[in-house]
């Protein structure tokens, strides 16, 4: 069995991605688990800018879930962000069936999309 791509030689004999996925590369005195990033903003010029958009913690989480599911993963900063991402996939003017007992924010967004003619 080859060593995992994250470089954790000590995990090369484990048959589960749950223990290995999303971990940082092995470096002397480096963390075994990814650090939790608590800052809301980052210095310009790198891959991360604003916490709600993206950060290193979310990147590690996506890698881990994607490895466990055998595909790609996208995480969101809130349930409404996830709901809006799904709503953006709805074809223009098509009917949408939703529960009347949904989260109020979801119901309000669906009503707004209906009033704009985006959904039926």
Predicted segments with their positions:
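Short, intrinsically disordered, charge-balanced linker/junction segments flanking boundaries
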Residues: 117-120
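Short, structured coil/loop segments at alpha-helix boundaries
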Residues: 1-5, 10-16, 55, 59, ...
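Conserved N-terminal alpha-helix of the aminotransferase class I/II PLP-enzyme fold
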Residues: 34-89, 101-114
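Short conserved active-site loop signatures built around small residues
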Residues: 2-37
């Amino acid at each position: 069995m080859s060593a995992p791509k994250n470089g954790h030689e000590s995990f090369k004999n484990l048959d589960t991605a749950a223990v290995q996925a999303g971990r940082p590369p092995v470096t002397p005195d480096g963390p075994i688990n990814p650090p939790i990033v608590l800052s809301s903003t980052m210095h310009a010029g790198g891959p991360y800018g604003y916490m709600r958009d993206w950060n290193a913690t979310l990147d590690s989480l996506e890698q881990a879930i994607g490895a466990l599911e055998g595909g790609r993963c996208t995480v969101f900063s809130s349930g409404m962000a996830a709901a809006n991402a799904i709503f953006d996939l709805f074809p223009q003017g098509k009917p949408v069936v939703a529960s009347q007992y949904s989260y109020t924010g979801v119901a309000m967004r669906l009503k707004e999309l209906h009033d704009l003619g985006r959904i039926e």
